């Protein structure tokens, strides 16, 4: 995306790539602290995933401003990064003993599988359509689905610290 705006210098691309990650790291800490302070997980996770999905989808608007694209990417990174530690607090609260071990193993297996499959699917979509838009929409939809699934599928008190 950064190169799509005409930034060709490798060092400049690298430095611009740091921005969403640095903003995301700070946001992760702030949002996770708030979730810990309030003890609320479900809504924090859902807000992060739904907001991250919206920020990702906004990248397909073909923004003509480099700053706007970088801002959308930074917001998406912040919310997606923040969703991860909040998510992992839920299974350990909801499951215990052998169920926790099996549940965490299942979640990890699904995550690893998606890490293998998603680059392949994104590559196929980009090759066939000549654009990343559909791939970004797919990622945004899956991200939103994860937030809704946790919000609907987990009891209200399971997302709270005990």
Report each predicted region and the residues it spans:
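Helix-terminus/helix-capping segments at the ends of transmembrane helices and short amphipathic helices
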Residues: 3, 35, 91-96, 126
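Loop-to-transmembrane helix entry
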Residues: 7-23, 102-106, 134-137
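Helix-to-loop junctions at the C-terminal end of transmembrane segments
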Residues: 27-40, 126
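A late C-terminal transmembrane helix in Major Facilitator Superfamily
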Residues: 94-131, 139
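C-terminal transmembrane helical hairpin of 12-TM major facilitator-type secondary transporters
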Residues: 39-90
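Multi-pass alpha-helical transporter architecture, strongest
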Residues: 140-162
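Residue-level signature of mid-helix packing/kink "hotspots" within the transmembrane helices
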Residues: 21-29, 112-116
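Short amphipathic helix-loop junctions that connect adjacent transmembrane helices
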Residues: 1-12, 126
């Amino acid at each position: 995306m950064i190169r799509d705006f005409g930034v060709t210098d490798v060092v400049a691309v690298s430095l611009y790539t740091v921005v969403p990650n640095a903003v995301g790291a700070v946001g992760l800490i702030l949002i996770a602290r708030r979730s810990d302070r309030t003890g609320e997980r479900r809504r924090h996770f859902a807000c992060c995933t739904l907001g991250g999905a919206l920020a990702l989808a906004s990248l397909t608007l073909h923004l003509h401003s480099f700053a706007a694209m970088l801002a959308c990417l930074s917001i998406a990174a912040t919310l997606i990064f923040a969703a991860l530690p909040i998510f992992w607090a839920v299974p350990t609260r909801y499951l215990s003993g052998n169920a926790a071990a099996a549940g965490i193993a299942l979640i990890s297996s699904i995550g690893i599988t998606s890490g293998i499959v998603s680059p392949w699917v994104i590559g196929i979509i980009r090759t066939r359509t000549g654009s990343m838009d559909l791939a970004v929409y797919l990622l945004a939809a899956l991200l939103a689905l994860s937030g809704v699934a946790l919000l609907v599928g987990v009891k209200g008190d399971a997302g709270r610290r005990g």
